Amino acid sequence: MANTTGRIPLWLIGTVAGILVLGLLGIFFYGSYSGLGSSL
């Protein structure tokens, strides 16, 4: 896991991507339940 070739670590990309996906899903579910996400 110490092979740093100047690129962004995969675990960091996975963590950020997971947080973004969970955030988007939360926004979509909240919008659909509150009636604001029908246009999305």
Swiss-Prot record:
Pfam hit, one: PsbJ
Known function: One of the components of the core complex of photosystem II (PSII). PSII is a light-driven water:plastoquinone oxidoreductase that uses light energy to abstract electrons from H(2)O, generating O(2) and a proton gradient subsequently used for ATP formation. It consists of a core antenna complex that captures photons, and an electron transfer chain that converts photonic excitation into a charge separation.
UniProt family annotation: Belongs to the PsbJ family.
Subunit description: PSII is composed of 1 copy each of membrane proteins PsbA, PsbB, PsbC, PsbD, PsbE, PsbF, PsbH, PsbI, PsbJ, PsbK, PsbL, PsbM, PsbT, PsbX, PsbY, PsbZ, Psb30/Ycf12, at least 3 peripheral proteins of the oxygen-evolving complex and a large number of cofactors. It forms dimeric complexes.
InterPro entries assigned: PSII_PsbJ (IPR002682), PSII_PsbJ_sf (IPR037267)
GO cellular component: chloroplast thylakoid membrane; photosystem II; photosystem II reaction center
Keyword Ligase assigned: no
Superkingdom assignment: Eukaryota
Membrane-protein topology: Single-pass membrane protein
Organism: Physcomitrium patens
Swiss-Prot/TrEMBL GO biological process terms: photosynthesis
Keyword line: Chloroplast, Membrane, Photosynthesis, Photosystem II, Plastid, Reaction center, Thylakoid, Transmembrane, Transmembrane helix
PANTHER family per record: PHOTOSYSTEM II REACTION CENTER PROTEIN J
Coiled-coil region: none
Cell compartments where the protein resides: Plastid, Chloroplast thylakoid membrane
Name under which the protein is recorded: Photosystem II reaction center protein J
